[in-house]
Amino acid sequence: MERVGTPEEERQAGPVLPTSLESDSSKRTSWGFLITGVVGGALLTVYAVATPFITPALRKVCLPFVPATSKQVENVVRMLRHRRGPLVDIGSGDGRIVIAAAKEGFPAVGYELNPWLVWYSRYRAWRAGVHGSAKFYISDLWKVTFAQYSNVVIFGVPQMMPQLEKKLELELEDGARVIACRFPFPRWTPDHTTGEGIDTVWAYDMSAQRGRGGRPNQEWVGQKNLSETAGLQASSSETRSKLLDVE
């Protein structure tokens, strides 16, 4: 005969949930953990992929990734005809300029700040069969010296062109050629131009840009700055003396 508990015992034991309700509650908890994990993983993936693209935009002067058109690549290759020596693409993006140059026989290097694009470029070079002559490196263009390159390609933006113009003029040899795409340099006069609109390409030969003055060097620039500073100091002293004489 089944024993029936007293009212006091039933109150202490509390309500007894059916087995089906306990199972549903456990399933809901499992689904909650699963959804949280999926959402968290997705957000982490988006962050990891997007950060290399967003970070350059936070810099004072950024070089955004805009893929070169097939016509732009064709125009760059045209400007490289009868040229020799190593080539560098400043801000190489997905590597199409470097790969095209390597196919033309140039030892080509691309510098890019976005690691995803660098890895993708290396894969594309391997697929194209030019991974031996097309190299890609993760680096900020302002931290790289370009003195060893005879051919320089840049897809720039207006804000960076004046500063880059000065950097290249200091570092490149007289025989080097700079090929600018989308935007020309502000002070240099192009020796060759091809294409129209967004596909326009400007070529600058360093020997022509410098004229008969030859290649400037860091020592000359330093002396020039010192001379300018000394001149300003002398002018300031002379002005001060005149003011004292008046008094």
UniProtKB/Swiss-Prot annotation:
UniProtKB keywords: Acetylation, Membrane, Methyltransferase, Mitochondrion, S-adenosyl-L-methionine, Transferase, Transmembrane, Transmembrane helix
Superkingdom classification of source: Eukaryota
N-acetylmethionine found at: M1
Biased composition (Basic and acidic residues): 1-12
EC category name: transferase
EC number(s) per entry: 2.1.1.-
InterPro entries (alphabetical): FAM173A/B (IPR026170), SAM-dependent_MTases_sf (IPR029063)
UniProt GO MF annotations: protein-lysine N-methyltransferase activity
Subcellular location: Mitochondrion membrane
GO cellular component entries: mitochondrial crista; mitochondrion
Function: Mitochondrial protein-lysine N-methyltransferase that trimethylates ATP synthase subunit C, ATP5MC1 and ATP5MC2. Trimethylation is required for proper incorporation of the C subunit into the ATP synthase complex and mitochondrial respiration. Promotes chronic pain. Involved in persistent inflammatory and neuropathic pain: methyltransferase activity in the mitochondria of sensory neurons promotes chronic pain via a pathway that depends on the production of reactive oxygen species (ROS) and on the engagement of spinal cord microglia.
Annotated PANTHER family: ATP SYNTHASE SUBUNIT C LYSINE N-METHYLTRANSFERASE, METHYLTRANSFERASE DOMAIN-CONTAINING PROTEIN
Name of this protein: ATP synthase subunit C lysine N-methyltransferase
Annotated source species: Mus musculus
